[in-house]
Amino acid sequence: MDKLILRHGAALKSKYGTAGLARIDAALRALVTADRRRGIDTLVLSVDEAAAMKAQGLAPVARTDAKSLKAAIDGLAGKLAPHYFLLLGAQDVLPLVPLVNPAYTGDDGDADKTVPSDLPYACEAPYSTDPARFQGPSRVVGRLPDPPGASKPDLLLQLIRAAARAEPLPREQFHTFFGLSAAQWQASTRLSLRNLFGQAEQLKLAPSQGPRWSKAELAPRVHFINCHGGDTSPEYLGQHGDDYPVAHRASLLRGRISAGTVIAAECCYGAQLYDPKDAGGHLGIALSYLADGATGFFGSTTIAYGPSEGNGSADLICQYFLQRVLAGASLGRAALEARQRFAGERTHLDPVDLKTLAQFYLLGDPSLQPVGFASHALAKTRAFKAAFAKVQDRGVRGLRRERLEREGLNLGRSLPRLRDSQQAPAASVEKVLRAMAKESGLDIRQVRRRSYVLQAAKQGPKVPARSIHMLKGRRTNGQLITLVATEQGGELLHVRRLHARGG
């Protein structure tokens, strides 16, 4: 089994009626046929239908039950071992898992009590709302969304049909980029773009640019965006001091996006799926991109973080995703490899990095390969083509999945877990942190602290007694600032400052 498309017939029928569901199923049959031509064996499975799930030895999934969906995916992974899981629909069709936000500090700080996430579906660990249990992703998972609350299936049909038509494009068509940044964060964004493309000359800054971008400006097939985003908002904002102008607007994308475009957005709520009725009838930016021909969107469901200079958290996971896409990976493999690299490069995941791992997810068919890669000379011979004509990439893909599964399992077994702690920092550490908070423009009387300890994984290395302290506060312009410090033996080992990408 190469690809498993999970649909919830009852939820789709409730949204779109019997006729709408029939149209969706017809489009899915066409996608299965297109996948077969691409060498991908695809099965569409109705997770709510008792007979279909009984045939797999599993219980059906209730409509809004993330726990049941997680159990079903775990069972299907064990029995069918698909190379790709495609979740069909938004969270009102197939739910996201409401993970507890490890960086939550109350309504005046990081107000996200939960982090809606697809990460648990990519992990072998059983259902939980503790994000620390999902530090070892090993499965390729993506979501082809529809608008929450929709009553007509037109957009979902459009996205399914676009996935059926999609083909890899030459690497040369991805040499240029559309880069957009809040002016306040341009140093960080320029570094990200140099890491991806070797230069950042085309970077657009808000203010004073945007949001009325021309078709030529939006034509590049890679978009990298580092702006402010907001809950249930169809806009991204720039920033310079206290000025927060609109930098990107969903309604202005129509007719301007090149087919096959791939986007990574660091913004808070950058890939949030919401009912358009809650935003004046406007789709979010992520869905608007897909509706206009983009192939994949990698972004966050909640408040995200990164530094104003240098790279960290959202900067890194977005870079890693695009690097793998540009190297010829499928969208889903790029997302999985980005998650694994992000988690694997760290001794431990602090509360902000743990939230980052949980909140970024893929919108798009995970099996699609946007960028074609150059074949080795042997692959061009007649003997090679004859030998692999019926399986194409399947054998090599299976080897890659073995490696990725091993990497994920090793991460899950070895990374220490974050646990809440009531222990205050050592006096010398607290003094330094308070001074840093003050120099960061925060009113120390309004700063909130949350502390943690690290718990060694059962099969991981021993972890010295080590504490993590997170301080959050807002500047006079309302911007949320976070200091994350690592303490060991009363000594300050490491500290970093992060800015919320909106919120």
Feature-to-residue mapping (PLM):
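Extracellular pro-sequences of secreted precursors
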Residues: M1-R37, L69, R401, E405-N410, ...
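Structured catalytic cores of large enzymes
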Residues: I5-R23, A34-R36, D41, A52-Q199
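Active-site-proximal C-terminal subdomain of hydrolase catalytic domains
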Residues: A51, D92, E266-V391
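Catalytic-core segments of thiol-dependent peptidases
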Residues: A72-P95, E167-P168, Q173-D278, L283
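Catalytic cores of nucleophile-dependent amide-cleaving enzymes
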Residues: A111-L156, N226, D231-I317
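Short, non-transmembrane alpha-helical segments in secretory-pathway proteins
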Residues: L418-A456
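Exposed beta-strand-loop-beta-strand "reactive/processing" segments of non-cytosolic proteins
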Residues: V447-E487
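A short, surface-exposed interaction/processing loop segment used at functional sites
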Residues: G478-G503
